[in-house]
Amino acid sequence: MVYTSTYRHTIVVDLLEYLGIVSNLETLQSAREDETRKPENTDKKECKPDYDIECGPNRSCSESSTDSDSSGSQIEKNDPFRVDWNGPSDPENPQNWPLLKKSLVVFQIMLLTCVTYMGSSIYTPGQEYIQEEFHVGHVVATLNLSLYVLGYGLGPIIFSPLSETARYGRLNLYMVTLFFFMIFQVGCATVHNIGGLIVMRFISGILCSPSLATGGGTVADIISPEMVPLVLGMWSAGAVAAPVLAPLLGAAMVDAKNWRFIFWLLMWLSAATFILLAFFFPETQHHNILYRRALKLRKETGDDRYYTEQDKLDREVDARTFLINTLYRPLKMIIKEPAILAFDLYIAVAYGCFYLFFEAFPIVFVGIYHFSLVEVGLAYMGFCVGCVLAYGLFGILNMRIIVPRFRNGTFTPEAFLIVAMCVCWCLPLSLFLFGWTARVHWILPVISEVFFVLAVFNIFQATFAYLATCYPKYVASVFAGNGFCRASFACAFPLFGRAMYDNLATKNYPVAWGSSLVGFLTLGLAIIPFILYKYGPSLRTRSSYTEE
């Protein structure tokens, strides 16, 4: 069948193979070819390279170049039982997939990210009704938003390293967590006490995190390196657009039925996404595809000596090493690396400001302009316009600043900071504009949203690219720490946001001084890209984490 051959390693095709309805003839032929290759020396020296859980698919985490290591590596490569790609044009290698298949995979990972990510803010239109039904205050009800955000900051600490192992891969994590995410939406829709709702929202946040944590990894699995920044930017734009579209959908559900239908909608969106991914989303993680090939070769030949290099390395990692790499190292790097600490703080404050808007919007658009729930949802469309413009600006800056430096050999990681330096002023501008023009006309706060996304989107892209380039060996730890800091601030800001605006409000300017407070904070933090552009090279030379 064309479907089973094109979409191998999907959940449906895997199930059909397990039930014996279809068979993998290509793998069987490969197994027979491998059986004809006999090892020249069965007593070869075993190579045991140093292992790091965060080692990428094409990067060795051990930098030793001794003769014994080189000899062991050469023997390992000549081992006839070591499963690898069948040459550079192997059709199972995700980098060699047809463009249509790659495009469908990118679309699906964007859809998965949007559906799960919108779960954070889709709740906000129903918050007042939840307060009334459960007889709780604003802060307690806001925990349903805050703990969801905290959950998807905690999840990547465990899920990201697991997704890089040969045994688990990305697909299994996506599908298992999405299934339980869907189930927990049923719980949220039927719960009858605020404590149960808060707990299920927190768990839902953890379950939604794999798409946020490893979606970029999926893109990198299938897209050629020169195109990765642009495709990642498109995926990131979708991730930003999702939580600002969600309040409109949530408002429509509350307006049509009640707050519980918000979670029924999220459940049905999750179910539709689950079905689509089950049929058309294949495994993209290179190590897992090779691991599957090795398992089939063992089964078809009856020879258990077939193995993959990454699975062999994974087995050498004990629980203590795994916990150190996933829990301790991100915190240690934040404390010891000034560049990481500075950008984690900058990104965290910017992300917290984003979720602060969910507290400010009702004050402005309901309190001043008397918008309905749906109209307030439409007021978030300024963020969506900003996403489109921000992605276009990112592409222009990338082509004008980054690409020429790659081509003429003058590229350094600090080149990415030029992008952040160009747009960092937009962040405080957006906050001042939102706060001080709230009573002039409703369109001006909406315009401020555009400036906000122009800044935040490009600062995020520049920061992540800079940190990944500076710390390639420990990029998973860097991003795990950044994600946790980001989610912690985004969790906290909505909890004190309403009190901050109420206490700093004046009669004519209800959100001006509150917005200005965080605006001045972001204005002070805007100096970070400039400082690191100047002192970044010297900081890298003194860092033990950037040594090759």
From Swiss-Prot:
Biased composition (Low complexity): 60-73
Keywords: Membrane, Transmembrane, Transmembrane helix, Transport
Transmembrane regions: 104-124, 139-159, 179-199, 203-223, 230-250, 261-281, 347-367, 376-396, 416-436, 440-460, 476-496, 511-531
GO cellular component, one term: cell periphery
Domain of life of the organism encoding this protein: Eukaryota
A Pfam family of this chain: MFS_1
Annotated localization: Membrane
GO biological process terms held by the UniProt record: xenobiotic detoxification by transmembrane export across the plasma membrane
Signal peptide: none
Topological relation to the membrane, as annotated: Multi-pass membrane protein
InterPro entries assigned to the protein according to its UniProt record, in alphabetical order: MFS (IPR011701), MFS_dom (IPR020846), MFS_trans_sf (IPR036259), Multidrug-R (IPR004734)
Region described as Disordered: 30-94
Biased composition (Basic and acidic residues): 31-51
GO molecular function, one term: xenobiotic transmembrane transporter activity
Task performed by this protein: Probable efflux transporter. Confers resistance to the azole derivative fluconazole (FCZ).
Family: Belongs to the major facilitator superfamily.
Protein name: Fluconazole resistance protein 1
